[in-house]
Amino acid sequence: MAGPGSTGGQIGAGALAGGARSKVAPSVDFDHSCSDSVEYLTLNFGPFETVHRWRRLPPCDEFVGARRSKHTVVAYKDAIYVFGGDNGKTMLNDLLRFDVKDCSWCRAFTTGTPPAPRYHHSAVVYGSSMFVFGGYAGDIYSNSNLKNKNDLFEYKFATGQWTEWKIEGRLPVARSAHGATVYSDKLWIFAGYDGNARLNDMWTIGLQDRELTCWEEVAQSGEIPPSCCNFPVAVRRDKMFVFSGQSGAKITNNLFQFEFKDKTWTRIPTEHLLRGSPPPPQRRYGHTMVAFDRHLYVFGGAADNTLPNELHCYDVDFQTWEVVQPSSDSEVGGAEVPERACASEEVPTLTSEERGGFKKSRDVFGLDFGTTSAKQPAQPASELPSGRLFHAAAVISDAMYIFGGTVDNNIRSGEMYRFQFSCYPKCTLHEDYGRLWESRQFCDVEFVLGEKEECVQGHVAIVTARSRWLRRKITQARERLAQKLEQEAAPVPREAPGVAAGGARPPLLHVAIREAEARPFEVLMQFLYTDKIKYPRKGHVEDVLLIMDVYKLALSFQLCRLEQLCRQYIEASVDLQNVLVVCESAARLQLSQLKEHCLNFVVKESHFNQVIMMKEFERLSSPLIVEIVRRKQQPPPRTPSDQPVDIGTSLIQDMKAYLEGAGAEFCDITLLLDGHPRPAHKAILAARSSYFEAMFRSFMPEDGQVNISIGEMVPSRQAFESMLRYIYYGEVNMPPEDSLYLFAAPYYYGFYNNRLQAYCKQNLEMNATVQNVLQILEAADKTQALDMKRHCLHIIVHQFTKVSKLPTLRSLSQQLLLDIIDSLASHISDKQCAELGADI
C-alpha cells in the first residue's frame, strides 16, 4: 500500500489524506499524479549561481555613458535601461542599455524628442513601453532654468520612439524625488518635492489609451505617511510599500503599506520584533527597494551621515526584517570580473566546497539532466558594492541589478552589480502549530483558570515543550491522577501513554491555575504555539491592559520571550491618552519596569503640563501623584544597565530540544521503522502532517503504534530522523542521501507545502561529491532514483582514482560493484585501457 500505516495493517496515504490534502495552500503545486517512487525524479546538475552572491559586472564605459546618480533604471526582457540623472556637472537625458546575457553596454536606439535632461524623475514599465514622469530639469552648472516637471513621456522599446503624452485637465503639481509604480494598468505617483515643500499626495493615470485618459487625485485614508521625498516604492500582493525617506524632523524608519483596492495606508508595526532579533534598517534616504517572491530588499542610501552597504530583507508574510549575509565568494576587493562573465557564458561546474552555496530552482519536478565537467577552473571572485545613495535598482528573473549612485566623496559611479536572490517555499512551522491551537483537535489537557474556573484546552506536547512552569504543573497533575487511580485500585492500562484501551482517546488531564484568567491565558497559549501574539489595536486602553495581564503571567511563568514581546508592545502603545491608566495598572500589578517607563513618559517637558491637566490625573491615587511630582522636581539618575537582555528560547529551539530528549516522558505514540520503535508525540505529528491528522482523527491504531514507510519504500533510519527534525522544528539540512528517501515525503504525509521537497531536490542537485557519492549511490539504488544513480556512476567513473580509496567502496553490494565496473568499461576507451595496462 502507498503510505505508512498502523501495525493493524497499512493504510494508503491517498485514502487517508484524501480529504486533508485540500488544506494544502492553493499556491503550492503538488503533482498528485506522480509515481509512488522517485524513479521519475529529474534533476539539473548545473550550472548554478551562488545564492546571495554579489557579482561586479562590467562598468559603463565613459564613451557609452557618463557615471551618474539620481537616475532611473527599468528592466525589460533581458536588458536594463538607464535614463537621465546627473554626472556632477550636467543633467543627462541619454538612454543606456545593458544586456544581462552578454554583459554588454550600448546606447539604446531612440527617435523622436526625448524628455529634457533631468534627475530625480521616475520611470516604470508598462506593456512594451517605459514611462518617465516629472523630475528636476535645468542647467545645474550655471544654476539656471531649474524647475520641477510634471510631464509624462513614453518610450517604446520595440521602435525606440519617444512620445510626450499631452494630458488635458487637472495635473499633479510638478515634482521630483517622488515614488512611482504601475498597478492595474495605471501609473501611480506618490509624494515628492515641489520646490518649496515635501508632498504626500497621490495621483494616478491610466496607461492603456493616452487619448482617453486623465490624471486623478487619489483620496487616501488610514495612516498616511508624512510628507517625504527620496524614498523607494515596491509593489507586492496588491499592496504598495514605502520605506523611510526624507521627511525633515519626521524622518523615521517606518514601513508603510498602501492597499490599492480600498486606498488605505497602514503603518506596519515593528513592536513584535524582539530585542536581540534583527531590527528594521536605520532611517535613510536615497536608497532602493525592490520586491522578489515574498520579500522586499532595501539597499544603500544615506543613514544618519553614513553610507551603509548592508542588504536588508523584509518578509511580507512574517513581518520581520533581517540583514542578508552575502555568500562567501562575494569578496570585498575581489578580482575584476571578466566582461564576458555573464548569463550567456557557460559557468564551470564546481564542487560544493567551491560553490559555497547554490541557487534555488523554483520548479520541483521538470528540469533536464545535465553533465559534469571533469575540469573545474576557479570561478572569478566578485565584490560587494560599497555604500552609496541615489543609485537605482531593478529585478530580472531571480536577480537584482544595481547601477550607479553617489559613493564616497561625492563621486558618481558607473558600476553595475548583480545580486542573486534565493527563493524557497516559506516555513509553515508556526502556522501549522497555530492551526492546531485554533482547531483544538487532539487536546489532552484542560487548564482550569481563576476563581470562575473557566476552562482552556491545549496539548501537553506543545505546552511542556515551551514552558517549564506549566510542565511542572502538568507533571504534578499526572502524579496526582496516578495516585488517585492507585488508591481506587483502578487497573493501569498497558497501552502507550495517552492511548486508552480500544483506541479511544483518554480523558483530559485537568490542571488548576488559580492565578490566571481565561482571556490573558489564551493569549499566552497562542504565543506558546506560534512564538507571537496577535497584537490588538495599538493605544486602545482595554487592549493595552489585556497585554499587561499577559505580561504579568509571562513573569509568573518565566517566559522571557513573551515578557519581552509584551513590554515592547506596551511601551510602544503608551501615549498621552492612556499613560495614566497604564501607569496605575502597572503599579497595581507591581510591574516596576513598566511603571518606570510610564513615569518617565509623564515627566517629559512636552508631556507634563498636558498630563496634569487631565481629569484622570485628579483620580490617581495619592502615592502615585506624589511620586510623579517628586520625579518631576528631582529626576532620579539614569543608570544604564550592562546586563544583557534575556530573550528566552524560540519555538524552534524548544521543539528541537523536545525531539532530542526533553519530551521523552510525554510521548504518546510509537513510530515503527522496520520494526525499530521511535516514540513521538501525536499532537506535533498531526499539526504538521495531514496524513497523521486524518489517521489520529479516524483510524487511530489500538496499540498506539504506526509503521513508517514512504509508498513501498522504508526510509533509512538516518533519513527518518531527518524527517522528524523537519516535522518537529522545520529543519531542512540533511545529508544528500537522505534527500532521496524524503523527496516524496511531502506528498505522502501531506505536509502543508513543498518546502522539504524543494530542499531535497536542491540538495541532490548541488551536493553530490566524491566524499558522499557512494552513500548516495546506495540510496538511489534502493529508491530506484534512476537519474541520480546514473549521475553517481558518472562521478565515480570520472573520479575513480579518488573513489577507489574510499572505505565505503568495499562494503557495497555485489550488484552495485558490478554496476560500477560496467560503467567503467563503457567509458574507458581503448587507449585508456592500454595506458591502464601499462600502469599495472
UniProtKB/Swiss-Prot annotation:
Any single GO CC term annotated in Swiss-Prot or TrEMBL for this entry: Golgi apparatus
Kelch repeat spans: 79-128, 130-185, 187-238, 239-285, 295-341, 399-450
Alphabetical UniProt keywords: Acetylation, Endosome, Golgi apparatus, Kelch repeat, Membrane, Phosphoprotein, Repeat, Ubl conjugation pathway
GO biological process, one term: protein ubiquitination
Main location: membrane
Family from the record: Belongs to the LZTR1 family.
Protein name: Leucine-zipper-like transcriptional regulator 1
Organism: Pongo abelii
Gene symbol of the encoding locus: LZTR1
